[in-house]
Amino acid sequence: MQYKSQNFSHSQNPKTGVLLVNLGTPAAPTAKALKPYLKQFLSDPRVVEFPRLLWWLILNGIILNVRPRKSAAAYAKVWTERGSPLAIHTADQASALNVRLQRRFDDQVVVAWAMRYGSPSMADVQQSLFDQGVQQLLVIPLYPQYSAATTGSTFDALSADFQRRRWLPALRFVNQYHDNPGYIAALAERVRQHWQNNGRADKLILSYHGVPLRYLHAGDPYHCQCLATSRLLAEALQLTESEVITSFQSRFGREEWLQPYTDVLLKQLPGAGVKSVQIMCPGFSSDCLETIEEIGEENREYFLQNGGENYQYIPALNAGEDHIDVLEQLVLDNLQGWSLAPTAKRELEQRQQRADSCPFNQTKKL
């Protein structure tokens, strides 16, 4: 195997990198852009655990000939002048976090963001970080609840890139923060602010992205962590079990997924006497297609068409100050024990001199 070379210099000041990773987005709201994005996403065996040959036939023979056009129409509804909402919010989160960390560590800590699927790719962003002298890397997948299909897949991509590199950084990886006190407090404050401006509804629905039920039976902790987040958030808001409902959205295919399904639930609630609902998606660190269009529009119609009277979506934390507080504390907690002080200029010069004088140094470049 040909390993990637590292542009290393003894005179370069070693830095620490913080990499925020989210799921991904197409380059444009068009069928042409959606096809390669969906192919990369749905080809991931972590996302679709199905016999590979059979799935390849289904994906390439049916799905990629039908779904890109349909998905493009949905993306077009949420696209902005700056691009995809998910990319915008993730970039803003990284920028705000970088400002916070610059105040603490000057330029010793570098913050970047990447997407698991699409652009900017993890491999490209990691290369950029290493080119800047990053020798310690903290990776934070922006999924509060762990699932093999999201956080696990992020680690797969990280590992695949590392397998091609000659030199590897010191590595730390945040695999979940579903019960992080700051995260729960930020969610609770977002709900309280909404209540202050809009009053309370009959029910607060906490909708998470669904996964097939068999993932739970195979040991994936996602379902348990979603329920834990809901319980802690309800406690923070002093709500009873009857006032909060946890549900799961965005199911794909015909097999059974985690229930109750959000869309089915919203069709049924008006018949049970629930005329007003407020819905939040705690598993989404940023608003995106699944929250803006699916929850904000599509599921609103289901509720109102079946007799509901008042439907309100509570936005994600996005790049709000309280969310940046959470991310900053996650970083500080996970950087403990690593050296973050800049290396003295004199020490760097001495390192370079020793390297230059080493008899085994043929190139004199290290």
UniProtKB/Swiss-Prot annotation:
SUPFAM superfamilies: Chelatase. GO terms for biological process: heme biosynthetic process. Pathway: Porphyrin-containing compound metabolism; protoheme biosynthesis; protoheme from protoporphyrin-IX: step 1/1. Pfam families: Ferrochelatase (PF00762). InterPro entries: Ferrochelatase, Ferrochelatase_AS, Ferrochelatase_C, Ferrochelatase_N. It is an enzyme of class 4 (lyase). One of its GO terms (cellular component) is cytoplasm. GO terms for molecular function: ferrochelatase activity; metal ion binding. It catalyses: heme b + 2 H(+) = protoporphyrin IX + Fe(2+). It is found in: Cytoplasm. Catalyzes the ferrous insertion into protoporphyrin IX. PANTHER family: FERROCHELATASE, FERROCHELATASE, MITOCHONDRIAL. This is Ferrochelatase. It comes from Teredinibacter turnerae (strain ATCC 39867 / T7901). The gene is hemH.
